[in-house]
Amino acid sequence: MAEVGEDSGARALLALRSAPCSPVLCAAAAAAAFPAAAPPPAPAQPQPPPGPPPPPPPPLPPGAIAGAGSSGGSSGVSGDSAVAGAAPALVAAAAASVRQSPGPALARLEGREFEFLMRQPSVTIGRNSSQGSVDLSMGLSSFISRRHLQLSFQEPHFYLRCLGKNGVFVDGAFQRRGAPALQLPKQCTFRFPSTAIKIQFTSLYHKEEAPASPLRPLYPQISPLKIHIPEPDLRSMVSPVPSPTGTISVPNSCPASPRGAGSSSYRFVQNVTSDLQLAAEFAAKAASEQQADTSGGDSPKDESKPPFSYAQLIVQAISSAQDRQLTLSGIYAHITKHYPYYRTADKGWQNSIRHNLSLNRYFIKVPRSQEEPGKGSFWRIDPASEAKLVEQAFRKRRQRGVSCFRTPFGPLSSRSAPASPTHPGLMSPRSGGLQTPECLSREGSPIPHDPEFGSKLASVPEYRYSQSAPGSPVSAQPVIMAVPPRPSSLVAKPVAYMPASIVTSQQPAGHAIHVVQQAPTVTMVRVVTTSANSANGYILTSQGAAGGSHDAAGAAVLDLGSEARGLEEKPTIAFATIPAAGGVIQTVASQMAPGVPGHTVTILQPATPVTLGQHHLPVRAVTQNGKHAVPTNSLAGNAYALTSPLQLLATQASSSAPVVVTRVCEVGPKEPAAAVAATATTTPATATTASASASSTGEPEVKRSRVEEPSGAVTTPAGVIAAAGPQGPGTGE
């Protein structure tokens, strides 16, 4: 019985150790799964030396064996229960290790009651079943397949594949089963059909860009510019340009300025030119350095034709070599490497390179030595000109159709405009002279650079802009012209007076006066009025005091329409008081220069007492044929209006009564004689008529037609207008 009990206990222990849920096997599996959590192995104990075998244990009673068996059985049961309790913990730990595996989170999936971080490149979404588990279970809904969605990450994008038969909505767009993988945006929402289950997807992947290198300065090391500007040659700087068409040229009567008059202006131009040359050379040097920096890096992507000549390309290629020499194939390789345009362009540019190498004297052919491998000769740059050619190798050439670079303030030509006699400071040595069309450069600018130049320009009595014809060198640029001042003496101009009518508008009664004159060469009509009554009731214009000359004589005048006729206003002379004369109406001869024909018309009419302070019309300062004097304060109580010849004829032909004014003074017995004397002195060139004398009752009479009376007739109305013809100083009383 003892053997049977011992055998049964040993079998029970063996069964416990070999069971799947054995604590030993579970511990071994846990140690394999979690090596860090496994306890360190116990140090090996030294084995005792071999000796006599131990005595066999005493035999146990059957109860003890049964107890041992029962205890062993109980221990086996307790072991089974311990293993059964430890198994779910191990499964949960394994699941947690899958979901919380080390590594950065790639995406986040959020639901109503969960949040899942995607750390693996592929995740499956569905519902758990006996056939297998998924990474993210969405519950037990039958509308969700066991494997419904699969999310995969392929840097830098996420892709979604639908595996469920019901499909899925992605931001409202239906994705069917078996459709190609859909690239997901940064954020989107999944919704399972026929359910309210939603998953919010958010990408957490951010591509870590390498930190940008700090920007280095464009020109870290700029050596000081060493520029040598030779002394300018006046003959080379002066570039006379023909006068453009359509401009106003200076009159030939003005004397030409001497050759050395504008020498100081060259100093001003030289300063501006030197500044512009400095700026241009600095820009060229900066462009060459920038081009050199870009050529040292990767191949440029600009496929446009480079703005360099073939000779410049050859110089760039040869100067980039270490030994300053290249073969023809090396030159080709350098050009195609740095300028992609020549990679796809026609091969004709290679012929141009060969022609430049063979025909340009700056390129020297060096034969290859026998020791050097390869074939073909080397090309070098002439050492005498290498520095200059390398400096100009990256200077962009001027495009076609664009004007060449020139100094905006071009050098002044020696043929500058003469100085104005009234403004000597304008042509001072500092300003250098006013620019005329002949001295303007092709790209010249009329804007003054000197601050005093503008003020001096403003002092010019008259300047104007002239627009050149299209196509001329200075087209579309204003040209400042200096016009010489006009001579002080008034030149007689053939100004034709049309027949006019001067009508008084404020006198209550009197005469309707009509003045007709034939095209004299006189510059103005003069009307004389005064508030004091003359001796015979008329306004009298006299030659002057007894013994006086016409230069000192004049009258208080009122210029009628001189501005309309384009004549200048200049100071005039008038009497302080108008002398009263006898009953003779006198005429005034022309005061023009001798030999210049002309007529001066003086209109005389009855004077009316005028109240002071009403309608003061100031006398403007004018000039009568170049004579000067002091104007007087005269009151113009009448408003005059000039009418056209058609209006005059219409007035004469109309049946309406003429404008009448009341007679102020009675006519003396000397008036007819004075009228006869005035009529006898008139010339055929001028004629005046007076019509419509008033009756004693003040009522107007019917207008009578104008008739030409014989020279001997003495019947003249009381109101007379006398006209003066060219007569000598002794003519008239």
From Swiss-Prot:
Omega-N-methylarginine, modified sites: R161, R191
Bias kind Pro residues: ranges: 37-62
Record PTM N-acetylalanine, positions in chain: A2
Any one GO cellular component localisation term in the record: cytoplasm
DNA-binding region: 305-400
Role, per record: Transcriptional regulator involved in different processes such as glucose metabolism, aerobic glycolysis, muscle cell differentiation and autophagy. Recognizes and binds the forkhead DNA sequence motif (5'-GTAAACA-3') and can both act as a transcription activator or repressor, depending on the context. Together with FOXK2, acts as a key regulator of metabolic reprogramming towards aerobic glycolysis, a process in which glucose is converted to lactate in the presence of oxygen.
Residues that bear Phosphothreonine: T245, T247, T422, T436
Species in which this protein is naturally found: Homo sapiens
Chain positions covered by the region annotation Interaction with SIN3A and SIN3B: 2-40
Protein's name according to its UniProt entry: Forkhead box protein K1
FHA domain ranges (all copies): 123-175
Keywords assigned: Acetylation, Activator, Cytoplasm, Developmental protein, Differentiation, DNA-binding, Host-virus interaction, Methylation, Myogenesis, Nucleus, Phosphoprotein, Repressor, Transcription, Transcription regulation, Ubl conjugation pathway
Lineage: Eukaryota, Metazoa, Chordata, Craniata, Vertebrata
Processing and modification events after translation: Phosphorylation by GSK3 (GSK3A or GSK3B) promotes interaction with YWHAE/14-3-3-epsilon and retention in the cytoplasm. In response to mTORC1 signaling, phosphorylation by GSK3 is prevented, leading to translocation to the nucleus.
Compositional bias annotation for Low complexity: 676-697
Classification via InterPro entries: FH_FOXK1, FHA_dom, Fork_head_dom, SMAD_FHA_dom_sf, TF_fork_head_CS_1, TF_fork_head_CS_2, WH-like_DNA-bd_sf, WH_DNA-bd_sf
